Curated annotation (Swiss-Prot):
SUPFAM superfamilies: Chorismate synthase, AroC. The keyword Amino-acid biosynthesis applies. This is Chorismate synthase. FMN binds at residues 130-132, 242-243, 290, 305-309, 331. Homotetramer. Belongs to the chorismate synthase family. Its EC number is 4.2.3.5. NCBIfam families: aroC, PRK05382.1. The gene is aroC. NADP(+) binds at residue 48. InterPro entries: Chorismate_synth (IPR000453), Chorismate_synth_AroC_sf (IPR035904), Chorismate_synthase_CS (IPR020541). It comes from Erythrobacter litoralis (strain HTCC2594). This reaction introduces a second double bond into the aromatic ring system. The keyword Lyase applies.
């Protein structure tokens, strides 16, 4: 199976399956001399880790990362990157493959089962194999390294909508994001979602979500025209995440409903004595114009579909083409967008770090 590598200069290759012995990634292109240990990566994996509450899958994975290569202790006793490929690995410890006996014989509508069979003629049905969101743990690990390459950039993801119930922007509180299991900046919405997601879980169903991600501290100039646009790469990165069906940069589709003057981001001269660049009065563009960052926050919204693996019976066909029904047992997220939030952050970090290195290679700064 090909197409397991992401990035141009900073290249991440992930490997492994949901119910295999381990998952891992190789991150190539990381500059040398960056202090890096497992403790720099683990907190981000802990944020994504399954089984922490009833609103996510009950699969219990400690997700303890090991750095296998690409680092060495310097003379100061600090472990640093060497510039060679960084290999990361996480062991799988809580697989229950017997839960997927029905999936071996029938396709889950909305899942990758049929598409994988149609393309390859063979698939690992245990937990979805390579198509499982288990793979995204390695994106989060690689994203943690990418953040160290761009230390002046702050990346924040949060859930803005679950099952059609959106946050109230007037109640936005960034401090609330880490205080509830939904990455929600609106405490009232988080309370409502407790009931909403729990009801879906008990009914054997699932819900979709919208995740927003904001990167602050991105300087003007990252990105490139035409075929290496920053927003183009962001869109592709987010669409590569399991269950993602839509991405908006800045105002996205709302921009199509505005007039030219409404959609403009008016510019004002920089404050006297400042070298911070012009001041913008709005950010409809999401911090990117012409495929290149403007110095404003880079923003995107990511739409996650409802989890396809549900206990509710759904009409389908078996591998012989006969009509049947399927109920997916196993352990699955009632709303995959919740744990998708750290993954969105990680992909933002990987894209931005890659473009920083591209910019430095071409422009020398």
């Amino acid at each position: 199976m090909s197409w397991n590598t992401f990035g141009r200069v900073l290249r991440m290759t992930t490997w492994g399956e949901s119910h295999g012995p381990a998952i891992g990634c190789v991150l190539d292109g990381c500059p040398p001399g960056i202090a890096l240990s497992e403790s720099d990566i683990q907190p981000f994996l802990d944020a994504r880790r399954p089984g922490q509450n009833k609103f996510t899958t009950q699969r219990k994975e400690p997700d303890q990362v090991r750095i296998l290569s690409g680092v060495f202790d310097g003379q100061d006793g600090v472990q640093r990157t060497t510039g060679t490929p960084i290999s990361l690995m996480i062991e799988n410890v809580d697989q229950r493959s017997k839960d997927y006996s029905e999936v071996a014989k029938a396709y889950r509508p909305g899942h990758a089962d049929y598409a994988y069979d149609a393309k390859y003629g063979f698939r690992d049905y245990r937990g979805g194999g390579r198509s499982s969101a288990r793979e995204t743990a390695m994106r989060v690990a690689a994203g943690a390294v990418a953040r160290l390459i761009i230390p002046d950039v702050t990346i924040t993801g949060y859930v803005r909508e679950i099952g059609g119930d959106a946050i109230d922007a007037a109640r936005f509180d960034s401090d609330a994001i880490g205080e509830n299991p939904f990455w929600c900046p609106d405490a009232d919405a988080a309370k409502r979602w407790e009931t909403l997601v729990d009801e879906a879980r008990k009914a054997g169903s699932s819900l979709g979500a919208v995740v927003e991600c904001v990167a602050e501290g991105v300087p003007a100039g990252w990105g490139a025209p035409i075929y290496a646009k920053l927003d183009g790469d962001l869109g592709g990165a987010m669409m590569s995440i399991n269950a993602v069906k839509g991405v908006e940069i800045g105002d996205g589709f709302d921009a199509a409903r505005l007039s030219g003057e409404q959609n403009a981001d008016p510019m004002r001269p920089a404050a006297e004595g400042s070298d911070a660049g012009p001041r913008f009065e709005a950010n409809h563009a999401g911090g990117i114009s012409g495929g290149i960052s403007t110095g404003q926050p880079v923003t995107c919204k990511v739409a996650f579909k409802p989890t396809s693996s549900i206990l509710t019976p759904v009409e389908t066909i078996d591998t012989e083409g006969n009509a049947t029904e399927i109920r997916t047992k196993g352990r699955h997220d009632p709303c995959v967008g919740i744990r998708g939030t750290p993954v969105v952050e990680a992909m933002m970090a990987l894209v931005l770090a890659d473009h920083m290195l591209l910019h430095r290679a071409q422009c020398g700064q």
